C-alpha cells in the first residue's frame, strides 16, 4: 500500500489529476515528488505537499484531508484510493474503474463524468454531486456514487447513467436527468426532477413538486424489488425504502417526460 501523508495546511488549491496508483507505480519516490500539482505561480509539487511512501501496489492511501484537495481520483482506471479526511471539488472526475473512498466530506461536482467504479463518501457532498460541470454533456455516466450523508442542490444534474445513493439531498435533485437511478433514503428539497427527461428518482419525501409531474398510481413493479435486493450491500436504508408501497409520479412533462419519481405511499 502506497501512502501520501499531508504535511500540513495547504497554501493553495492543489490538483491531484492523474495522481493514481497506476501513475505512481512506475516512479521512484523522488520522481513522484517532482510531479506538479499546484494551481498558482508557487509551482507546488507532490513532494512539497505530501510525505511520499510508494510500494508499487494498486492501493493508495492519502492520510490527512483538506477541502483544497481537488480532483482526487480523477481518471482512476484501476486499483483503489482512500482519503482519510475531506476533499475538494471534482472527486473522481472521469473515473473509469476501481474504488475511491473518502472518510470525510467532498466538495461540489463529486463523480462528474465518472463512467465506472465505485465512489463512496462517508460524510456529505457539495452541490452538483454526480452532476455535469460547465459545458459538459453529462454528469455521472455509469459509475456508482454512494453518499452516506447529505448531498447539496442539483444532485445528479444531467446524469446519464449509473447509480447514486444518498442520505438526503437539496433542491433540484435529478435536474435535467438523462438516465440512471437515484435513491435518497431521506428528504429531497424543492423541485426534484426539474427538466428531467428519463431516469428514476426514489426518495423518502420531497419538497414542493413541479406542476409538470403527474401522479400515476402505486404500481407493483418487479424492477423495484430487484433494485432493493441489489442495494442491500451498498445502502441498507435505501434498500429498506424500496420494500414498501411507492407512489409514482411521471415527468418532467415540460420536456420529454419519461422520468419517474417514487415516494412512499
Curated annotation (Swiss-Prot):
Kindly give the Pfam families that the UniProt entry links to this protein.
Answer: GXGXG
Miscellaneous note of the record = Although FhcB and FhcC do not possess a formylMFR dehydrogenase (Fmd) activity and have an unknown function, they are required for the stability of the complex.
Q: Does the keyword Translocase apply?
A: no
The UniProt entry, under InterPro entries, shows: Formylmethanofuran_DH_suC, Glu_synth_asu_C, Glu_synth_asu_C_sf
State the superkingdom.
Bacteria
Coiled coil location:
none
Q: What name appears for this protein in its UniProt entry?
A: Formyltransferase/hydrolase complex Fhc subunit C
> What lineage is this protein's organism placed in?
Bacteria, Pseudomonadati, Pseudomonadota, Alphaproteobacteria, Hyphomicrobiales
**One Gene Ontology cellular component annotation?**
cytoplasm
What is the annotated localization of this protein?
Answer: Cytoplasm
Write out the GO biological process terms. Answer: formaldehyde catabolic process; methanogenesis; one-carbon metabolic process
Q: Supply the source organism for this entry.
A: Methylorubrum extorquens (strain ATCC 14718 / DSM 1338 / JCM 2805 / NCIMB 9133 / AM1) (Methylobacterium extorquens)
The function of this protein is: Involved in the transformation of 5-formyl tetrahydromethanopterin (5-formyl-H(4)MPT) to methanofuran (MFR) and formate via the formylmethanofuran (formyl-MFR).
Principal subcellular localisation of the protein: cytoplasm
Q: Describe its assembly.
A: Octaheteromer. Part of the formyltransferase/hydrolase complex fhc; composed of FhcA, FhcB, FhcC and FhcD.
**What is the primary gene name for this protein?**
fhcC
Amino acid at each position: 500500500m502506497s501512502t501520501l501523508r499531508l504535511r500540513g495546511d495547504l497554501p493553495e488549491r492543489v490538483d491531484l489529476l492523474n495522481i493514481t496508483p497506476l501513475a505512481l507505480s512506475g516512479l521512484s519516490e523522488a520522481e513522484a515528488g517532482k510531479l506538479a500539482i499546484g494551481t498558482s505561480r508557487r509551482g507546488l509539487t507532490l513532494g512539497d505537499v505530501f510525505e511520499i511512501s510508494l510500494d508499487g501496489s494498486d492501493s493508495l492511501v492519502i492520510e490527512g484531508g483538506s477541502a483544497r484537495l481537488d480532483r482526487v481520483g480523477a481518471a482512476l482506471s484501476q486499483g483503489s484510493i482512500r482519503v482519510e479526511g475531506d476533499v475538494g471539488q471534482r472527486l473522481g472526475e472521469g473515473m473509469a474503474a476501481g474504488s475511491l473512498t473518502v472518510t470525510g466530506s467532498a466538495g461540489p461536482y463529486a463523480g462528474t463524468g465518472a463512467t465506472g467504479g465505485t465512489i463512496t463518501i462517508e460524510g456529505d457532498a457539495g452541490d452538483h454531486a454526480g452532476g455535469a460541470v460547465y459545458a459538459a454533456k453529462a454528469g455521472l455516466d455509469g459509475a456508482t456514487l454512494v453518499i452516506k450523508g447529505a448531498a447539496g442542490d442539483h444532485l445528479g444534474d444531467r446524469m446519464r447513467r449509473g447509480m447514486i445513493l444518498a442520505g438526503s439531498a437539496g433542491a433540484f435533485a435529478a435536474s435535467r436527468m438523462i438516465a440512471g437511478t437515484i435513491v435518497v433514503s431521506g428528504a429531497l428539497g424543492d423541485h426534484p426532477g426539474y427538466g428531467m427527461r428519463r431516469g428514476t428518482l426514489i426518495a423518502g419525501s420531497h419538497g414542493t413538486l413541479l406542476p409538470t409531474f403527474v401522479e400515476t398510481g402505486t404500481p407493483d413493479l418487479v424492477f423495484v424489488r430487484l433494485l432493493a435486493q441489489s442495494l442491500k450491500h451498498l445502502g441498507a436504508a435505501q434498500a429498506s425504502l424500496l420494500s414498501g408501497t411507492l407512489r409514482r409520479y411521471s415527468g418532467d412533462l415540460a420536456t420529454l417526460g419519461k422520468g419517474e419519481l417514487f415516494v412512499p405511499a
